[in-house]
């Protein structure tokens, strides 16, 4: 079965898209969210893994191995989270997860700031670090030839339909 991985910075719409697909296609698509494992404090990440990047990479490997096992059960898999495309690629190779597609869910900075500050009431996330992270992921997706789904002016329904075409 197909494994679709939605990556992106906060506010891009990946969780909203995943939740929409989960509610409409629960019989055929199993949805997983990276953050549901719990995100430790920065101090805990450093103490346990050496850096936030190392924590993220280790958890990406854990997730990809879990997704690989879930895909063998015969259902389509949708996973969303914030991690590097390079970590997903390395983990997929190690897990033998060859049939997957990684998509960047993205939006412009103005839309991201509005979603984080107004819609989610988390203005502290709409900072330069998040915009830099979004730019990093955009560059990584482009250089790796990954699909980019720009949700800036696209409805949630249209975005969900776009992702679901990978399950057809």
Model-inferred region functions:
Residues 121-162:
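Small-molecule kinase domains that catalyze NTP-dependent phosphoryl transfer to phosphate-bearing small molecules
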Residues 12:
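ATP-binding Walker
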Residues 9:
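P-loop (Walker A) phosphate-binding loop of NTP-binding proteins
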Residues 6:
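Hydrophobic anchor at the beta1->P-loop junction of P-loop NTPases
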Residues 19-65:
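Conserved substrate/cofactor phosphate-moiety recognition/catalytic segment
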């Amino acid at each position: 079965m197909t494994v679709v991985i939605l990556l992106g910075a906060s506010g891009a719409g990946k969780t909203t898209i995943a939740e929409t697909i989960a509610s409409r296609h629960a019989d055929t698509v199993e949805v997983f969210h990276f953050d549901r494992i719990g995100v430790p404090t920065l101090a805990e990440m450093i103490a346990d893994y050496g850096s936030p990047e190392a924590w993220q990479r280790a958890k990406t490997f854990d997730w990809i191995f879990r997704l690989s096992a879930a895909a063998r059960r015969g259902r389509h898999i949708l996973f969303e989270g914030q991690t590097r495309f390079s970590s997903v690629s390395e983990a997929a190779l190690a897990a033998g997860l060859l049939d997957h597609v990684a998509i960047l869910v993205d939006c412009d900075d103005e839309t991201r700031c509005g979603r984080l500050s107004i819609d989610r009431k988390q203005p502290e996330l709409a900072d330069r670090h998040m915009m830099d992270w979004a730019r990093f992921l955009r560059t990584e997706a482009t250089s790796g030839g990954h699909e980019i789904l720009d949700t800036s002016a696209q409805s949630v329904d249209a975005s969900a339909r776009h992702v679901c075409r990978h399950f057809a």
